[in-house]
């Protein structure tokens, strides 16, 4: 989820982490209770390729839909919930300053990057809500998790699902038991359904009309 409000325009790859439509943080804040989940904004794929080129845009879209519902100002609080989500950058920054002053851990932005990871991934108070920087940090976390999970001999899709669990919890199991991995997969299906053209279904066989 710069002192200037980020534009909502979504402005090769070393590896591609892909969730098949048919079918990352050491702390676990409440997922940001943003507005109802919506389809990826127009141009998100191009934006994702520019900001997090190591992760397939479809995978990122599913992750971001689950984490923040594409709200760049979303805030998730560890062990608690906000009464509502911020409606502006200024409100988001005021909220995170208040949380930090009380020693409360939180995650922010599109990819819900936890504040304990800011230094490692190049974020700070002035940049944590910039969509591209936030997405780049989230992509880096997921890529690191995937490198760890794929090194265990898992098949590619199993390794990706384990990486999603790692993104959520820092390990390869909690994301499954909590239902997080299933929610990301469901988001991938919803994105594919809402972003593409629905196929024509098969017609039912009906008896010929009586003559």
What do these predicted regions represent?
Residues 57-62, 73-75, 150-164, 196:
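Surface-exposed patches in mature extracellular/periplasmic domains of secreted proteins
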Residues 38-42, 50-58, 86, 104, ...:
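Soluble non-cytosolic domains of exported or imported proteins
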Residues 11-12, 24-98:
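Export/targeting segments at the very N-terminus of extracytoplasmic proteins
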Residues 34-43, 48, 192-211:
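Proline-rich, low-complexity linker regions of envelope-associated factors in Gram-negative bacteria
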Residues 64-68, 112-117, 141, 152-179:
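Acidic helix/loop microenvironments that form the catalytic cleft of cell-wall polysaccharide enzymes
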Residues 4-18:
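Bacterial N-terminal signal peptides that target proteins for export
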Residues 34-35, 46-51, 78-83, 99, ...:
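Second-shell loop/turn segments in exported
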Residues 89-157:
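Alpha-helical segment that forms one wall of the substrate-binding/catalytic cleft
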């Amino acid at each position: 989820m710069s002192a200037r409000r980020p534009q909502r325009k979504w402005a090769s790859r070393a590896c591609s982490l892909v969730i098949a439509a048919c079918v990352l943080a050491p702390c676990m804040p409440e997922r940001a209770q943003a507005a109802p989940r919506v389809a990826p904004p127009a141009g998100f794929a191009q934006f994702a390729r520019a900001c997090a080129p190591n992760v397939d845009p479809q995978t990122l879209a599913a992750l971001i839909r689950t984490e923040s519902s594409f709200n760049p100002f979303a805030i998730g609080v560890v062990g608690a919930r906000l009464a509502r989500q911020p409606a502006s950058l200024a409100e988001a920054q005021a909220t995170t300053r208040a949380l930090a002053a009380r020693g409360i851990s939180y995650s922010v932005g599109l990819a819900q990057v936890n504040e304990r990871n800011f230094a490692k991934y190049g974020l700070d108070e002035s940049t944590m809500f910039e969509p591209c920087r936030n997405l780049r940090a989230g992509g880096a976390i997921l890529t690191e998790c995937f490198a760890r999970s794929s090194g265990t001999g898992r098949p590619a899709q199993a390794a990706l699902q384990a990486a999603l669990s790692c993104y959520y919890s820092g390990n390869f199991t909690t994301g499954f038991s909590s239902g997080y991995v299933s929610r990301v997969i469901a988001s991938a299906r919803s994105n594919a359904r809402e972003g593409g053209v629905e196929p024509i279904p098969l017609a039912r066989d009906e008896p010929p009309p009586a003559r």
